[in-house]
């Protein structure tokens, strides 16, 4: 029974520690389109947003957009991701 409780708590902690899948947004609040790009392009974009990886997703009919795997909601926004990487950019730290 104790093992089951430890496993359950571990799963809950891991799920809250990891992010989810989000479409990253540029500094203009637009999504990164990938109509003529590859999964490698989206992977690079997503890693800049501190995601585990990324791919080109076509969930919106004809439009294709980069989707990031395991990224926090905050880091899906361009300036939030920059502030996470460089604390000197954080407005509240000044």
Curated annotation (Swiss-Prot):
Record PROSITE patterns: LCN_CSAB
Keyword DNA-binding assigned: no
UniProt similarity note: Belongs to the long (3 C-C) scorpion toxin superfamily.
Recorded GO CC terms: extracellular region
Function comment: The homodimer inhibits HMG-CoA reductase (HMGCR) (32% of inhibition produced by 0.6 uM), a glycoprotein involved in the control of cholesterol biosynthesis. The inhibitory effects of bumarsin are seen at much lower concentrations (0.6 uM) than that for statins such as atorvastatin (5 mM) and simvastatin (10 uM). In addition to inhibition of HMG-CoA reductase, this protein lowers cholesterol levels by inducing steroid hormone synthesis via StAR, and by increasing reverse cholesterol transport mediated by the induction of ABCA1 and APOA1.
UniProt-annotated location(s): Secreted
Source species, domain of life: Eukaryota
Phylogenetic placement of the source organism: Eukaryota, Metazoa, Ecdysozoa, Arthropoda, Chelicerata
InterPro entries: LCN-type_CS_alpha_beta_dom (IPR044062), Scorpion_toxin-like_sf (IPR036574), Scorpion_toxinL/defensin (IPR002061)
Residue span, LCN-type CS-alpha/beta domain: 20-87
Signal peptide: 1-19
Pfam families listed in its UniProt record: Toxin_3 (PF00537)
Single GO molecular function: potassium channel regulator activity
Swiss-Prot/TrEMBL keywords: Disulfide bond, G-protein coupled receptor impairing toxin, Ion channel impairing toxin, Neurotoxin, Potassium channel impairing toxin, Secreted, Signal, Toxin, Voltage-gated potassium channel impairing toxin, Voltage-gated sodium channel impairing toxin
Tissue and organ expression note: Expressed by the venom gland.
Cysteine pairings via disulfide bonds: 34-56, 42-66, 46-68
Protein name: Lipolysis-activating peptide 1-beta chain
Subunit-structure text: Homodimer; disulfide-linked or monomer (edited version) or heterodimer of an alpha chain (AC P0CI44 or AC P0CI45) and this beta chain (non-edited version).
Domain notes: Has the structural arrangement of an alpha-helix connected to antiparallel beta-sheets by disulfide bonds (CS-alpha/beta).
């Amino acid at each position: 029974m104790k093992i089951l409780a430890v496993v359950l708590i571990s799963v809950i902690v891991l799920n809250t520690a990891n992010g989810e899948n989000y479409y990253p947004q540029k500094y203009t609040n637009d999504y990164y389109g990938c109509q003529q790009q590859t999964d490698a392009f989206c992977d690079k974009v997503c890693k800049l947003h501190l995601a585990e990886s990324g791919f080109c997703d076509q969930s919106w009919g004809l439009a294709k957009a980069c989707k990031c795997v395991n990224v926090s909601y905050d880091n899906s926004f361009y300036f939030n991701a920059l502030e996470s990487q460089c604390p000197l950019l954080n407005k509240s730290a000044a």
